[in-house]
């Protein structure tokens, strides 16, 4: 009979840790990457510390590159302290483009989209994200840190409301409702492919991000505009590379698309490389051997006391 899997190569995972214990076999096939490409979201203090240790890529969101840049720099610095190449941590910023062949066409499209947007829906969305009931504040109440005293569900998002910028000089429920109804509080760029590409480059330059998590207003319309209008402009600028001709028939993993062909597994400087099956197995066996020796020593000692190693005389 043909075998789908060689049973001799299926290993049992035995783990006992602080938060959970298990003894089982993995239930899915290993991918060419072995460890999935590791995305993380959030730039709070706890999130930044976690990201600097574990994340290969981070979803970030901010209304301004000026506000985002220090957060990116902080995480890169933390990664360096942990022995990682800070540039190996990739940042993908939320970005919603509204595109037209011309700036005028894009503006007309944006005005039409706003006519369908629900500002109340935007407030409900943000209230759910942050745990703050924005409906209890007057529309033009300027939000401050004193208002951020409720259940903090998304701490890094909540922090945005206490940081202003040239793009958003003040945060009020009215401003939040307008921003959240299209773009979800991230940047919205309206214009021709050239204008939107200029804005993308500005974010890369000023915030030090590596890529973008493209938001949409309509589907599939927003994505069709990106493919048909924006991508050709980015390729003309040489900042959105095509797959090399010699590699077009090859399969690329998600990690290779970020780090380059050949980097299927975790980088050598990543924390996860310490956790390989053989290493874990050796550690577990060493711990079990140590426990057996301790038990043997205790059994050999009189009156149930633990045997002590005799000091050697010189």
Placement of each model-derived feature along the sequence:
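C-terminal helical cap(s) of enzyme catalytic domains, especially alpha/beta-barrels
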Residues: 69-77, 219-239
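An alpha-helical appendage that flanks or caps ligand/catalytic pockets
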Residues: 1-33, 69, 79-202, 234-298, ...
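Glycine- and acidic
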Residues: 52-61, 179-186, 208-217
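Active-site-proximal loop/turn and secondary-structure-junction residues that shape catalytic pockets
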Residues: 44, 64-65, 95-99, 218-220
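Short, acidic/polar
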Residues: 40-50, 192-205
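Hydrophobic faces of well-ordered beta-strands that scaffold small-molecule active sites
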Residues: 36-41, 56-60, 89-96, 212-214
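Conserved, mostly hydrophobic/aromatic
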Residues: 38, 51, 106, 203, ...
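Long, repeat-rich segments with strong aromatic
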Residues: 37, 47-57, 62-64, 71
């Amino acid at each position: 009979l043909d075998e789908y899997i060689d049973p001799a190569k299926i290993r049992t995972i035995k783990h006992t840790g602080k938060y959970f214990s298990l003894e089982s076999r993995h239930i899915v096939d290993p991918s060419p990457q072995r460890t999935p490409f590791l995305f993380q979201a959030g730039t709070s203090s706890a999130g930044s510390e976690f990201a600097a240790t574990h994340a290969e890529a981070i979803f970030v969101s901010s209304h301004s590159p000026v506000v985002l840049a220090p957060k990116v720099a902080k995480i890169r610095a933390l990664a360096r302290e942990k022995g990682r190449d800070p540039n190996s941590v990739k940042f993908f910023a939320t970005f919603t483009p509204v595109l037209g062949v011309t700036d005028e066409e894009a503006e007309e499209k944006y005005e039409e989209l706003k006519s369908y947007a629900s500002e109340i829906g935007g407030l409900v969305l943000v209230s759910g994200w942050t745990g703050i009931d924005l409906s209890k504040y007057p529309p033009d109440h300027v939000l401050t840190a004193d208002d951020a005293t409720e259940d903090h569900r998304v701490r890094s998002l909540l922090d945005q409301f206490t940081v202003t910028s040239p793009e958003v000089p003040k945060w009020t429920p009215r401003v939040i409702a307008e921003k959240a109804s299209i773009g979800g509080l991230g940047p919205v760029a309206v214009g021709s492919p050239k204008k939107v590409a200029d804005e993308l480059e500005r974010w890369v330059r000023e915030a030090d991000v590596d890529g973008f998590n493209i938001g949409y207003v309509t589907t599939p319309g927003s994505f069709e505009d990106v493919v048909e209008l924006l991508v050709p402009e980015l390729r003309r600028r040489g900042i959105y590379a095509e797959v090399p001709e010699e590699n077009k028939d090859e399969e690329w993993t998600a990690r290779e698309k970020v780090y380059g062909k050949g980097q299927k597994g975790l980088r050598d400087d990543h924390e996860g490389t310490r956790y390989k099956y053989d290493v874990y197995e050796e550690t577990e066996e060493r711990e079990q051997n140590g426990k057996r020796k301790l038990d043997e020593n205790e059994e050999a000692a009189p009156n149930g006391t633990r045997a002590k190693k005799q000091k050697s005389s010189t």
